[in-house]
Amino acid sequence: IVNTANDHVVVGTGCDGAVYRAAGYDELLNYRREYIGFVEEGGAFITPGFGLNARYIIHAVSPRFIDGDHGEEEKLRSCYRKSLQLANENGVRSIAFPLISTGGFGYPKEEGLRIAVDEINAFLFESEMDIFLVVFDEKSTRLGEKIYPDLEAYIDLHYVEVANETEYLPDGFGVAQTGRSRNFED
């Protein structure tokens, strides 16, 4: 699987927090501290899957969207490229990506989806792998269905509602382990 990671050794909310909890929070965090450390936005690194039913976790260091004029697109493209390269180098036959940076880091969902599909298609033109793009929220699902009518949706919306209630505070803000808060509006 691919996880959306922070550049510093901290655990965020959303996908990052869910992956750490499922894989084994302390074990994964200690591994990152000991063997990985700081990674620039747009970079990627690989860890064992630990408690997950996955051989590896590929962590894509997600760019924060500012205004589109600070290299965000190239950093986001780099996340997909480097993640796919790591997967290929490690013999991965199938991989699941979240829609990187389109949650708490504020990347516009439509643009993020276009970039994901572009980079995945470019990779598949040269290599063979089963690639799944997993969208979590209803807005991203609707957007995907609009742009790609044959999109296969497989998310229990009740699960999404429960996860949102437990993951994020009622005022719409999520708090990462760093103590920083981020707005999670659509």
Region spans (language model):
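Macrodomain-like recognition of ADP-ribose-binding/processing modules
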Residues: I1-D186
